[in-house]
Amino acid sequence: MAPERWDDEEDSVSPPPVAPRRRFDDEEEDEVLDSWDAAEDSEVEREKAAKAAEAKAKADAEAAAKKKSKSQRIQEHKEERKKKAEEEDSDSEEEDDADKRARLRRAQKDADLKHAEDLFGDIDLNRNRGAPKAIVISDSADPTQAVDLSAMPLFKPTTKEQFARLTSTLIPLLTPHSKKPHYSLWAQEFAKQLVKELNSADVKKIASAMTTMSNEKMREERAADKGSKKSKAAKTKVSLVTSRDNKLDADYDNGDDGLGDDDFM
């Protein structure tokens, strides 16, 4: 009977617990790095998605703006200017009159520039060192009415066609004053200022062109004077012949032939 008790004791003994495998330090660092990489990848993806959405929204806004007519853009510009003025008025109740006038002038100038952009096309407001300085034309009666001509594409020509357009715009504005006393003096000074930045070879070409034009003008004036002299001489000759004929007729009517009434007796 003793062996059976031993068997029971052996069956009742439980197996020893298995000790868990210990993780090494490098394994824990690898898991942390993997989690960081995953977080960085997700952050990069979110940034890419945000940039793509922003670019798409900007492109959609530009496309919608291009589809708008000029009248719609002008109307939106007026509404935007009115809204901006109202906001500035509400925010600057305590400002003095001088500051208010200066602010209104700046706002009007910005509004006029935007209005000119709507009328004449896109304006490059990112001026660099080579860009011309601002040429602001203001109304003497209302100083707040001012326009920067240098910002208009018309006054920033680069191609031959653009220079031709500039010429066709300025000439009709200037030549009507050619009969005024100071026009010729102004034209001389204006021409000097125009060629001031050119080299001597280009100035010589322009001077040669002016000489050619001067010679043509002289020929035209001489031809006109010659025609005028011929016409005047012809009129003088006709006048002399007519006067002589009238004198002869008058002498005949008056009996100025040297014969008296007694000569026939």
UniProtKB/Swiss-Prot annotation:
Q: Coiled coil where?
A: 61-95
One MF annotation (Gene Ontology) recorded for this entry? translation initiation factor activity
Write out the biased-composition intervals (Acidic residues): 1-12, 26-44, 87-97, 251-265
Subcellular location per the Swiss-Prot or TrEMBL entry = Cytoplasm
- Per the record, the major location class is cytoplasm
Q: Which UniProt keywords apply?
A: Coiled coil, Cytoplasm, Initiation factor, Protein biosynthesis
Query: InterPro entries, alphabetically?
Result: eIF3-like_dom_sf, eIF3j
**This protein's record includes keyword Ubl conjugation:** no
User: Which GO CC terms are listed, alphabetically?
Assistant: eukaryotic 43S preinitiation complex; eukaryotic 48S preinitiation complex; eukaryotic translation initiation factor 3 complex
Q: Does the keyword Cell wall biogenesis/degradation apply?
A: no
Where does the source fall among the domains of life? Answer: Eukaryota
Stretches for region Disordered: 1-113, 212-265
Biased-composition ranges, Basic and acidic residues, are 45-65, 73-86, 216-228
Query: Which terms does the UniProt entry file under GO BP?
Result: formation of cytoplasmic translation initiation complex
Task: Give the function comment from the record.
Answer: Component of the eukaryotic translation initiation factor 3 (eIF-3) complex, which is involved in protein synthesis of a specialized repertoire of mRNAs and, together with other initiation factors, stimulates binding of mRNA and methionyl-tRNAi to the 40S ribosome. The eIF-3 complex specifically targets and initiates translation of a subset of mRNAs involved in cell proliferation.
HAMAP family with a match to the protein in the record: eIF3j
Instruction: Note the subunit structure.
Output: Component of the eukaryotic translation initiation factor 3 (eIF-3) complex.
Q: Which family does it belong to?
A: Belongs to the eIF-3 subunit J family.
Give the protein's recorded name: Eukaryotic translation initiation factor 3 subunit J
Originating species: Aspergillus oryzae (strain ATCC 42149 / RIB 40) (Yellow koji mold)
Q: What is the lineage of its organism?
A: Eukaryota, Fungi, Dikarya, Ascomycota, Pezizomycotina
